[in-house]
Amino acid sequence: MARFTDRQLELLQAYVDKTVAAFGSAGLVFSVESDLAAWADTMRSAPSITAVSPSFDPEHSWLTPANSFWVCLRDGSGNVVGCICSRLFETDDMMQVIRSYRLFFDRKPVLDLRPLRLVAPDDVPIMSGRVGYTGGYWLHPEWRGRGLSRLLPRINRALALRRFDLDWLFSLGRDTER
């Protein structure tokens, strides 16, 4: 059963079109990519990156064009200046996927389980079915402060909702000193 009406899909597409046009007005080229190894390579050489998310790295996770993609912004010279990823899980309980570390390392079992602190109220419903996860966000330091950090994650979520026909969509965050 489709989760979105034709009208809702039209609204998602209108948002995508408007956002892609805004990127173009800023001199950027927007693309949707399916090769997550290219994303991981980009992250390994990106300024201001301290770690590459294993959830979106094919060395650690089962990623295919059917269950994952990344969106990319390139400048006029073709250099990646921003990106973020989406991934689909089909599960009976997403919290169990997170607690078992399969969210991060589903290619190999994790034998040294460190405590994973999940903060969620007791009344949060079980996330099950088609669950989308977004992460691996990066924006080049020279392009920060221009509103792209608002647009790039939102267009990524819109595309994930449309592409994967999701029941749920989430991201994880961590506290930083900023």
What kind of region is each of these model predictions?
Residues 97-178:
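Acyl-donor binding region in acyl/amide transferases
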